[in-house]
């Protein structure tokens, strides 16, 4: 899907080098196509890296996507310049009167805090409430998934004894679901988190289904019955070197961090990572865009 991105967005250089099809605003304007309008709530501190990761996954289909990035006003970013946010981001107040075909809520490194103690929690709750009537389908990632399950369904998160860190094997638990069309019987996805949601809490809610899970990592993909909300507990969007960079960062900070499981060749950091989740990640996001956004959204928003 050609994505329409602003001129000079830092992600453009990386996407071009990776042969990901995107268009500048002028070319997109001259195409007689109604783009899918996707709002991306970027909660990650490394916003530019996350922009590239998300755009890479929504940029591989014949339809046109118009992404809108928003950041939370109630949190001051320490890792992204004010100039970048002004140039490439909106706030919720600026977009709340619009409707969107889809929404993506990223993860955030705040999982050890209670939801209510996150400084932008009230603002995020307003975004969640707004999405019920203004967004066709939302995909939530990692902490964003835990936050969405808590807000919409009252499902709590629990702290793990040690960080879940690595690439884990998953199996489908529901096969006749559009979101998982084309998935292998077994597939891999990265996880990097300190908290989890209990399977039994999800299963108690008749409006939710666990579509895929892992013996080691637990519930992975959860969907509401109508497909309006998708919750992905891992990080399918991660670059090949993301876990390695996290490992090096934590090690340099003197943390007692184990090497990420099933990630380095022969479990040897010197041999580098082996990417086993790229195909799954692309299929997950392309299925969501096609079956839950494009096929379901009203043509006129």
UniProtKB/Swiss-Prot annotation:
E.C. number: 2.3.1.31
SUPFAM superfamilies: Class I glutamine amidotransferase-like
Site (Important for substrate specificity): 192
Site (Important for acyl-CoA specificity): residue numbering on this chain: 111
Family: Belongs to the MetA family.
NCBIfam families, alphabetized: metA
Protein name per its UniProtKB record: Homoserine O-acetyltransferase
